[in-house]
């Protein structure tokens, strides 16, 4: 019989981040988790005006290394309540509309959590042509069981956000499934690397671990965070598409696998010298990596950090992920651990005052 795959125990810090509800612009719960784990170990800690968390190690170190991963996630926001008490919504971030209906959701209100279900007209009540169409947002709603508008308004306000009610679960072996691995995994990686640097051999660099806000609606947190941190070099950690499923053309998207290791980006948004250092650090640490080519600004915080102030040499590390921007994203926890190890190795490789050019 084949040997049963053993599941690694998920880090408690990661699970707490995933349990935190933090749609873009409403990241309070995720900020609280970061502060709980990281603030006690930081030489300095602050939250900027857009809600990004900055933890600093080595106040007088040089160069300044910024590690960035975003704590916000996709969500919904209530825009209208009809006379029957049904809630209409817009999306926070880039949703696949085919995935919205029939989901359990949690609405985050001032009074607490309100449970709901996303609904639309049943397929039995559609014409043949309508069945082939993707519903528009205004053709879907959230049902909270209210009898009318008055009752709904007593529980929910216009502008309240909502998230899919999907929790972290082990899948098989080292694979796991959750909503918002994009990019709670990246936020976990940069902060866990920070904690290991604080606990072990200190780097000569000043390290600023930034849990950025509002990435999903235009890398807004990274824009202000890069100005505040003023780094000499930056590493951005975000999820990247694993293409090891049945419907991915490797000729278009490249070949990337869960369990294949961190994905390092080459292209205009990634500084060549930073890429080479990451690659060398991976070789030395015996970390398998995958290489991605992207000729344009990426859909990550790197697109903002790279052009902050007078420009920042930036590297991009991807965590392979299946089913991005759905309620059930899948990663390999071993890839995540290797991203943390690579961040630590890069930080410790820096020489005093080193510049990348």
Where are these regions (language model features)?
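N-terminal hydrophobic/helix-forming segments and targeting peptides
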Residues: 1-357
């Amino acid at each position: 019989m084949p040997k049963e795959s053993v599941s690694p125990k998920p880090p408690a810090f990661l699970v707490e981040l995933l349990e935190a509800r933090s749609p873009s612009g409403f990241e309070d719960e995720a900020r609280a988790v970061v502060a709980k784990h990281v603030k006690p170990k930081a030489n300095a800690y602050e939250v900027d005006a857009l809600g990004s968390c900055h933890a600093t190690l080595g106040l007088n170190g040089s160069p300044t290394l910024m590690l960035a991963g975003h704590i916000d996630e996709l969500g919904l926001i209530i825009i209208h309540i009809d006379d029957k008490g049904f809630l209409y919504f817009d999306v926070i971030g880039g949703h696949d509309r085919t995935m919205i209906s029939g989901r359990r959701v949690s609405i985050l209100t001032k009074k607490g959590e309100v449970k709901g279900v996303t609904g639309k007209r049943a397929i039995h009540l559609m014409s043949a042509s309508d069945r082939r169409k993707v519903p528009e947002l205004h053709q879907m709603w959230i049902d909270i069981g209210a009898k009318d508008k008055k009752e709904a308004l007593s529980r929910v306000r216009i502008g309240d956000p909502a998230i899919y009610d999907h929790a972290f679960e082990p899948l098989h072996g080292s694979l796991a499934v959750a909503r918002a691995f994009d990019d709670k995994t990246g936020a976990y990686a940069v902060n866990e690397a920070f904690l290991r640097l604080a606990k072990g051999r200190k780097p000569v660099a000043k390290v600023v671990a930034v849990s950025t806000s509002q990435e999903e609606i235009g890398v807004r947190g990274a824009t202000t965070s890069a100005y505040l941190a003023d780094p000499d070099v930056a590493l951005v950690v975000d999820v990247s598409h694993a293409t090891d499923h049945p419907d991915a053309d490797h000729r278009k998207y490249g070949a990337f696998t869960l369990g294949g290791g961190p994905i390092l980006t080459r292209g205009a948004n990634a500084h060549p010298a930073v890429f080479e250092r990451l690659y060398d650090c991976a070789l030395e640490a015996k970390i398998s990596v995958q290489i991605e080519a992207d000729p344009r600004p990426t859909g990550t915080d790197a697109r903002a950090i790279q052009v902050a102030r007078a420009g920042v040499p930036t590297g991009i590390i991807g965590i392979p992920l299946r089913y991005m921007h759905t309620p059930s994203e899948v990663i390999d926890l071993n890839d995540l651990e290797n991203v943390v190890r690579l961040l630590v190795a890069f930080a410790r490789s820096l020489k005093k005052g080193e510049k990348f050019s």
